[in-house]
């Protein structure tokens, strides 16, 4: 099984924290991108254990339109080549009912509220979707 994680995140502080935890505590290899074409190319290339997807991306665009992590996850789940890759949504939008709404809307396998302060919780969430 692959140990590669695609991290789709636009906040440099979150990228550094998540990437460091995944590498040092989880033993994962981490690829970071917020460019939709690169995300799709990496995902279609296979060999990913999971994708961690920020829901609110500020700089991502697809076919000339600004898009968020919800849209990108929907693209991935519609594509037969990428639909089986587990997606863990990561979002600061952690209001009551958001988890269920986002999971249903995207078909993602997991949800993690940000900010993430507990490395063990992050590793546990990633391992849970990898096993799903």
What are these regions (language model features)?
Residues 9:
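Conserved acidic carboxylate
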Residues 12-37:
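Two-component/phosphorelay signaling modules centered on CheY-like receiver
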Residues 32-50, 54-60:
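Acidic, metal-coordinating helix/loop segments flanking the phosphotransfer/catalytic sites
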Residues 47, 81-86:
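His-Asp phosphorelay/catalytic-motif detector in bacterial-type signaling
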Residues 60-83:
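Short amphipathic alpha-helix used as the core "switch/output" element in two-component signaling
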Residues 63-67, 71, 94-112, 120-124:
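Alpha4 helix (beta4-alpha4-beta5 surface) of REC/receiver domains from two-component response regulators
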């Amino acid at each position: 099984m692959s140990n590669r994680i695609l991290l789709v995140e636009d906040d440099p502080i979150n990228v550094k924290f998540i990437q460091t935890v995944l590498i040092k505590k989880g033993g994962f290899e981490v690829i970071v991108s917020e460019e939709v074409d690169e995300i799709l190319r990496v995902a279609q290339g296979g060999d990913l254990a999971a994708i961690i997807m920020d829901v609110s991306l500020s700089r991502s665009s697809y076919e000339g339109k600004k898009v968020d992590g919800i849209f990108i996850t929907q693209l991935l789940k519609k594509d037969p080549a990428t639909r089986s890759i587990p997606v863990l949504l990561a979002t600061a939008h952690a209001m009551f009912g958001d988890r269920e709404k986002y999971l249903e809307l995207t078909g993602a396998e997991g949800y993690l509220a940000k900010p993430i302060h507990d490395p063990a919780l992050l590793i546990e969430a990633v391992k849970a979707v990898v096993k799903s």
